Amino acid sequence: MSLTQLQERIRARKTPLALTLSPELDRLSPKILKNFTDMFGDVPMARTEALRYHGTSLLDAAAGRLPAVVLRADAYLSQGMMGADVLSNLITAAHAKELYAILDVNATDPAPWLSYGADAVTVCPYAGKDCLTVPEDRLAIAAVRTGNPSGGEVQTLLAGDRALWLSLAEKMARRGAALSVATGYSLDVRDVRRVCPSAFLLLPGCDGENALPAFDDFGHGALLADETLQYTADPAAAVTEAVAALKKWVTVV
């Protein structure tokens, strides 16, 4: 059911583009940090409130324009319990703005993370089928290929006649999971679509041109996640521009 909801949001917004929230404090506007430091002092609360303000502002920019938001859990949980509170609040705010919320945590056991209220959770496929145990109204997205620098050391090892990550993708897709494939290469996208022709793909950091093999003739089948939008000076204008740029490659009908 949860995947159906995501696909409905994509069709309603006419774009397969999601906002990614994975903020690094040293990349936020100095003005935002200064405002909260002046208010609370140089304490954890100032930093977490800056993250809350930053995230809320971006959700406002995405509302009505984008179908979904991807929230990187570690960006908030690194700030402790107050960061966890911000993460939960942002998921609630995303729902209020009719954005499908994906919690990116790569969980081996999704159960503890479902309490945050996200519609979907990314899971670690190396835990086996246990990582896919979610209620019918939630979605497990298996992170078969990750974007961290050393990920390829394991994920590209050969498993039979193909890379390990492709073998995992096939197994996860057979069990009904969506797949997260962090790549900027069209060859990777083409390979996973060949192995998993019906799987829904989340493509972090991939542009429209390289993501093209993921989509069918109706612009269905995948969601791109853009983390550059979170650092723009004018998020609303940046979202509008990103949607227009993607439409040159993918048209949703």
Task: Mark where each language-model region is.
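Short, acidic/polar
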Residues: 47-62, 109-113, 165, 210-213
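C-terminal helical cap(s) of enzyme catalytic domains, especially alpha/beta-barrels
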Residues: 214-253
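Alpha-helix-loop-beta-strand connector modules within alpha/beta enzyme cores
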Residues: 56, 81-103, 138, 194-196, ...
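Conserved anion-binding
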Residues: 24-25, 29, 36-37, 42, ...
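Conserved N-terminal beta1-alpha1 strand-loop-helix module at the mouth
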Residues: 1-86, 93-96, 240, 244, ...
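Conserved, mostly hydrophobic/aromatic
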Residues: 19, 69, 121, 192, ...
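Catalytic beta/alpha-barrel core
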Residues: 69-80, 100-107, 119-130, 143-145, ...
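A C-terminal functional module that forms or caps the active site or interfaces directly
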Residues: 184-224
